[in-house]
Amino acid sequence: MRQFIVTGHDAPTTPDFSLDDIAGGAGRLDVLCRCVNSAFFLSHDIREDVRVHLVLGDEYTVRFEGSELRRLNPDERSTAALIRKALEKREEAIGHMPAESSPGVSIRRMGFETTLEEAASDATVVELHEDGDPVVQVEPPENPLFVLSDHHDFTDEEAELLAAAADERVRLGPEILHADHSITVAHNYLDTAGYSRY
């Protein structure tokens, strides 16, 4: 299982946003939507062995489960609609118990720390960092959990939690990439067994 946590610092925590303004009025929800699409889409298929956790404003986590996903289309607007539908169910999420909003999409009342702890319980936590080891020098983990931020840096508290939880600290290349591009590169690294199998 490949997992990705993406924290959205300005992401909406209510469904009161326009699907026509996800890059502005919805707190750069477009960044999170691109991450979801990069995590799941192949040319003519969906990666079923992937789970994505979107942390919205450190208040809710929307989980996408690849093996159960339906109605995910490769455009940001329809992905934002799935997130909005999940937020419409937020009152049904009791404690850490999820509320399913559509097949493969659920919402939980969990912030970054709890989401990281839960996802890390059966995964190798990989911190992507510009000062990390080159990814080509690191053996691809069997059940990786990549943790990324939106267009903002991690807060100091998030960075400390991640540093404490990380099993590996790697960099994907000489340049800093957008979160959605990092997901694509991470998939390629795993698909090719560390760039050794094509």
Swiss-Prot record:
InterPro entries: Alpha/beta_knot_MTases, TrmY, tRNA_m1G_MTases_N
EC numbers for this chain: 2.1.1.257
Pfam assignment, any one: Methyltrn_RNA_2
Residues engaged in binding S-adenosyl-L-methionine: L128
Keywords: Cytoplasm, Methyltransferase, S-adenosyl-L-methionine, Transferase, tRNA processing
CDD domains: TrmY-like
Subcellular location: Cytoplasm
Chief localisation class: cytoplasm
EC class (word): transferase
Disrupted-gene phenotype: Deletion leads to the absence of 1-methylpseudouridine at position 54 of tRNA, but does not lead to any obvious phenotype.
Transmembrane segments: none
Catalyses which reaction(s): pseudouridine(54) in tRNA + S-adenosyl-L-methionine = N(1)-methylpseudouridine(54) in tRNA + S-adenosyl-L-homocysteine + H(+)
GO molecular function (one): tRNA methyltransferase activity
GO annotation, biological process: tRNA methylation
Record-level GO cellular component terms: cytoplasm
Family that this chain belongs to: Belongs to the methyltransferase superfamily. TrmY family.
Described purpose of this protein according to its UniProt entry: Specifically catalyzes the N1-methylation of pseudouridine at position 54 (Psi54) in tRNAs.
Subunit structure: Homodimer.
Protein name (Swiss-Prot/TrEMBL): tRNA (pseudouridine(54)-N(1))-methyltransferase
Organism annotation: Haloferax volcanii (strain ATCC 29605 / DSM 3757 / JCM 8879 / NBRC 14742 / NCIMB 2012 / VKM B-1768 / DS2)
Higher taxonomy: Archaea, Methanobacteriati, Methanobacteriota, Stenosarchaea group, Halobacteria
